[in-house]
């Protein structure tokens, strides 16, 4: 059976793994998931990630990050979903927690943070909020 929302599944796996203090979490890989993981790494929310292939299936393994025994990601929530896509123009891209968090946006120039999208003057689909 196919998954209806693989991005929500990825975010839920990260959230659940951090609740039980796992050091890493694995999930089926895709280009979009790898791009989201790259943004999380660049913003300092995860230690790193790797794509591993076994038996023709690629797995994305994310190394989770903790500070003083607490997860670095306090909140990770899906915004745009298959049943209700959320698109924002360059002037309407939201800030998360007054700039303390990031909104991950997929644009014609790739997946990036809300700050980079605003600086580039482009809008897109708001995938999730991370704080």
From Swiss-Prot:
UniProt cross-references to InterPro entries, sorted A to Z: Ribosomal_uS8, Ribosomal_uS8_CS, Ribosomal_uS8_sf
One GO cellular component term: ribosome
Keyword list, A-Z: Ribonucleoprotein, Ribosomal protein, RNA-binding, rRNA-binding
Pfam families: Ribosomal_S8
MF-aspect GO terms: rRNA binding; structural constituent of ribosome
Protein's GO biological process: translation
Name of this protein: Small ribosomal subunit protein uS8
Species of provenance: Leptothrix cholodnii (strain ATCC 51168 / LMG 8142 / SP-6) (Leptothrix discophora (strain SP-6))
Gene label: rpsH
């Amino acid at each position: 059976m196919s998954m209806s929302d693989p991005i929500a599944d990825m975010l839920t796996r990260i959230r659940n793994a951090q609740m039980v203090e796992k050091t890493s979490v694995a999930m089926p890989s895709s280009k979009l998931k790898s791009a989201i993981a790259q943004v999380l790494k660049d913003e300092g929310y995860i230690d790193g990630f790797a794509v591993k292939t076994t038996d023709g299936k690629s797995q994305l393994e994310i190394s989770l990050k903790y500070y003083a025994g607490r997860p670095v990601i306090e909140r990770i929530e899906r915004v745009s979903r298959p049943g209700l896509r959320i698109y924002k123009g360059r002037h309407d891209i939201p800030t998360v927690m007054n700039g303390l968090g990031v909104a991950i946006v997929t644009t014609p120039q790739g997946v990036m943070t809300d700050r980079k999208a605003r600086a580039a003057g482009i809008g897109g689909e708001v995938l999730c909020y991370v704080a």
